[in-house]
Amino acid sequence: MTETWNFINTGSKDPYYNMAMDEALLNFVSRGEIDPVIRFYTWNPATLSIGYFQRLQKEIDIDKVKEKGFGLVRRQTGGRGVLHDKELTYSVIVPESHPNMPSTVTEAYRVISQGLLEGFKNLGFDTYFAVPKTPEERQKLKQPRSSVCFDAPSWYELVVEGRKIAGSAQTRQKGVILQHGSILQDIDIDELFDMFIYKNERLKLKMKEAFVEKAVAINDISDEHITISQMEEAFEKGFKKGLNIELKPLELTEAQLAEVEELTEKYRSDEWMFRK
């Protein structure tokens, strides 16, 4: 019998709400209030999100982010900086105890990302999992050279034509797995690299050139322009097939929505943003 999970598309929201909703959904699943959930969302304004462990003032040019009119938010997941602009963002929230969820982070990535793999197939892309094969490649995962996400595939992230096409991060809290990530529709590499601090311009240029070789957006390799709504349809079907589930619409209660609003203030606060 096929299991049924929740599905919610919260549309285009500000960065604080987006991160608050992910944390709130994790809380609701942890408390047993809702079944596992898949969420889709986009960002308004375009936002630079940084990983939980990143050093904001050492790695990010905050004035440049403000000058461009972008949002800035710290995630509760690890990883590096991501510019959320022309993309579909997804979250998967599921108990660690779920029978289909492996105990290790990398294997759970593989299971959850099967939904992404099927979504890319639905859009006509020959996509596969990146699995670092050599000790050198595995060491690079532990010591990334840049603050920018997408500049190298990590375990079981998705690659098409040798370049990373979806970047994801995972956290485990309160007995629950939260994996969220970006599915790039288009990317402006100059905009992205302008927001990070480098020792010198030569290093910045070198990193940018390496990034172009290693990362790609859907419309860079598609013969036809693919819209966000087409992506939503493809990946909703992809998660159903990849995880062997059905999806039902999730409607949150007034009390649950109030919890989201309360958490929004946490992500808006300087205390959270400048914690590292």
UniProtKB/Swiss-Prot annotation:
Positions marked as site (Lowers pKa of active site Cys): 164
UniProt-listed Gene3D superfamilies: Bira Bifunctional Protein, Domain 2
Residue ranges occupied by any BPL/LPL catalytic domain in the UniProt entry: 32-247
Top-rank lineage group of the source organism: Bacteria
Database matches in InterPro entries: aa-tRNA-synth_II/BPL/LPL, BPL_LPL_catalytic, LipM, Octanoyltrans_LipM/LipL
GO molecular function per UniProt: lipoyl(octanoyl) transferase activity
Protein's pathway: Protein modification; protein lipoylation via endogenous pathway; protein N(6)-(lipoyl)lysine from octanoyl-[acyl-carrier-protein]
Keyword line: Acyltransferase, Transferase
One Pfam family per UniProt: LplA-B_cat
Catalyzed reactions: octanoyl-[ACP] + L-lysyl-[protein] = N(6)-octanoyl-L-lysyl-[protein] + holo-[ACP] + H(+)
Active site: 149 (acyl-thioester intermediate)
EC numbers on record: 2.3.1.181
Gene Ontology biological process terms in this record: lipoate biosynthetic process; protein modification process
Self-association and partners: Monomer.
PANTHER family recorded: OCTANOYL-[GCVH]:PROTEIN N-OCTANOYLTRANSFERASE (PTHR43679:SF2), OCTANOYLTRANSFERASE LIPM-RELATED (PTHR43679)
Protein purpose: Catalyzes the transfer of endogenously produced octanoic acid from octanoyl-acyl-carrier-protein onto the lipoyl domain of GcvH, an intermediate carrier during protein lipoylation.
Note: In the reaction, the free carboxyl group of octanoic acid is attached via an amide linkage to the epsilon-amino group of a specific lysine residue of lipoyl domains of lipoate-dependent enzymes. The reaction proceeds via an octanoyl-thioester enzyme intermediate.
Similarity comment: Belongs to the octanoyltransferase LipM family.
The name this protein goes by in its record: Octanoyltransferase LipM
Natural source organism: Staphylococcus aureus (strain NCTC 8325 / PS 47)
Primary gene name: lipM
